[in-house]
Amino acid sequence: MHLRARAVMVAAWLACRLPEAPLLALADLAGGAWYRLATSRRRRARRNLTRVVRWLADHDMGSPEVRAAARDGRVLNHLLRDAFRHAARYYVQLVRAPIVDAKYLDRWLVIETPGVIEAALGDQRGALFVGIHMGWFELPAMVAAARTGQPALVPSETIGDPALQAYLVRTRGVLGLRLVELSSAKRLLKAALAEGGTVGLLGDRDITGGGIDTEFFGAPSPLAAGPALLAMDSGITPHVFGVWRDAAGVYHVSVEPIPFPVEGSRRERVSAYLRAEAQAFERYIAAAPEQWLAIFHPLWADLEAALAHVPVRPAPSASSAIEPAP
């Protein structure tokens, strides 16, 4: 067994047996250090977050703090540091996933749209959920598995370490999640829906390279085409969800159906669906943009091009102004 896999297993074993509060406090410290040290990651996240908060402010969306971040560099810096802390917290929760059970979900998860979720899971044709990399985004799939008694299929990138990959598959299987490799995902997901199963996808990042440019926070961004194609081929209405964490540590999940268009060419229908999906993503991200983990990754081509010509800078202080964004 590789050293990395063994280290992850030991860390997970300890994390599942220690109180959550000190672990999250440690994650906050680690996130703060990460913010200061990860120059390139911080620079990309700043550009992406700046675009998000400015768009939200222009559309009267988001909390007062989020809208203030659009014009006040100190507030933006605070929000950006929180983004690193939330990312660190997510990894802590991820290694603690084996302790998640019905009692845990009842205590730490609030379903804002229970009727919508029940209706989706009650559809005998199957259920298709599409989410974003925000909060603890695996929680809805865990809820679906607990409610239906059947595993929810979730596409996942394969890790180069076989021992670590096997560990992830095993631990997620205990939670009711069946991880499937991206190479065989299309076939397996279609088969699962045909049998009335539950499928969970994430649509805010183009991981495979086949994304379709869609207006997202005011600029074209390649969104994953998989959810749209799966909805079109299966005839099942996708249910888009968002997950965010409140100040008390409680997670909230909200779900809404996004009907797939029935008129127009195949390309027109896919494009129209993705635009409606992106608008739903924008509404969920508005609740807590600092918890949207995708800001650490390439999202918009124009911002990536700008990053290539920006010199490396040290971590900004609380009084620093917003860096310019195209």
Positions of predicted regions on the chain:
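A generic secondary-structure micro-motif detector
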Residues: 1, 35, 107, 130, ...
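Membrane-anchoring hydrophobic helices of lipid-metabolizing enzymes
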Residues: 1-128, 167-170, 176, 319-325
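Short Gly/charged-rich anion-binding patches and loops
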Residues: 10, 44, 115, 139, ...
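Non-catalytic C-terminal accessory region of glycerolipid acyltransferases
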Residues: 34-37, 62-64, 68, 81, ...
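Active-site metal-coordination segments of metallo-dependent hydrolases
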Residues: 42-44, 158-162, 220-224
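Catalytic core of membrane glycerolipid acyltransferases/transacylases, capturing the structured
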Residues: 89, 123-183, 209-212
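Short, flexible loop segments at the rims of nucleotide/cofactor-binding pockets, characterized by
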Residues: 103-109, 174-180, 216-218, 263-264
